[in-house]
């Protein structure tokens, strides 16, 4: 959750969505 929050704050919501779409699986595992 922290990583996603920081990424969203730095890159912006649009970039966050693109990042999540590309690495949704990795994000879920890393953040959970």
From Swiss-Prot:
Heme binds at residues 16, 25, 28-29. GO terms for cellular component: periplasmic space. Its main location: periplasm. It is found in: Periplasm. The keyword Nucleotide-binding does not apply. GO terms for biological process: anaerobic respiration. The keyword Protease does not apply. Transmembrane segments: none annotated. One of its GO terms (molecular function) is metal ion binding. It comes from the Bacteria. Binds 1 heme group per subunit. Keywords: Electron transport, Heme, Iron, Metal-binding, Periplasm, Sulfate respiration, Transport. Monomer. Participates in sulfate respiration coupled with phosphorylation by transferring electrons from the enzyme dehydrogenase to ferredoxin. This is Cytochrome c3, 10 kDa. It comes from Desulfuromonas acetoxidans.
């Amino acid at each position: 959750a922290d990583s996603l929050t920081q990424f969203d704050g730095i890159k912006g919501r649009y970039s966050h969505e693109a990042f999540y779409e590309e690495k949704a699986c990795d994000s879920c595992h890393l953040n959970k």
